[in-house]
């Protein structure tokens, strides 16, 4: 049983903490929070131990939230830390993890240099075995890598061109925008996603462009893949249908808009309406000779959660990729095939 700390209890952190509680081989030591907001109150209500910076102890206690200790205490009590702090903050905490000789999992908002390896479970789990510091790539990069590494099982992927329509903010991020604009992210090519993919697949020819859209629900990707050999559409659909963490969306559902997919998640009683699987629209899959085009939706709040769980096992050499992915999927109810 591995003891896991989660530093940060926001959009990703609370989902990772809940996922750890569902693993048969992990124990959640507690979570770190810096302010006593509603998320801290909910964590306390769930019985999760809360650790805070030394200077914040009084503020939490005055709010009625008992404190289990400092963030340093949390790190010392754990075998490994999943750092889900805001972009760039994880690198500031790394010296603490090093001080106590603890392994750590970082998120895609950190620079790749913060870790020994960037990670995507379906692509390079074995390369991450025993690595002390692992960086789980961002939500968009996770989706790109899952898709690319899956199609690579049909025949070698030689080139990728992708356009990413990014959500402007998570649903709780009320101070972010835009509200009525499309914003190039950036107006230069490539966007950072290509470099991020290359941090996992070193020599892949990939170019990405991105734009921010006024929505909070999901991202959308439109990708063009050039393969080494000619393929049939049925082979591409088959590998997508039979790969875990990817689901197909059929037009017969009459639910292709991201808002409709969120409603599907509600009706399926998904926790927090999460869909951690890449959602590929099956009618969008186009194949001609060695060229494949497709579009899919990405739920940015949950897609990296199973990757974090697998990264814990890879870092601590708990088990093989196949076993870890299977246990994670089963414990979190993650599907393959068609969503409905």
UniProtKB/Swiss-Prot annotation:
EC code: 1.2.1.59
A family per Pfam: Gp_dh_C
Keyword ATP-binding: no
The entry's keywords: Cytoplasm, Glycolysis, NAD, NADP, Oxidoreductase
Organism whose genome encodes this protein: Saccharolobus islandicus (strain M.16.27)
Single GO term (MF): glyceraldehyde-3-phosphate dehydrogenase (NAD+) (phosphorylating) activity
Enzyme active site: 139
Oligomeric form and interacting partners: Homotetramer.
GO CC annotation terms, alphabetical: cytoplasm
Name the record gives this protein: Glyceraldehyde-3-phosphate dehydrogenase
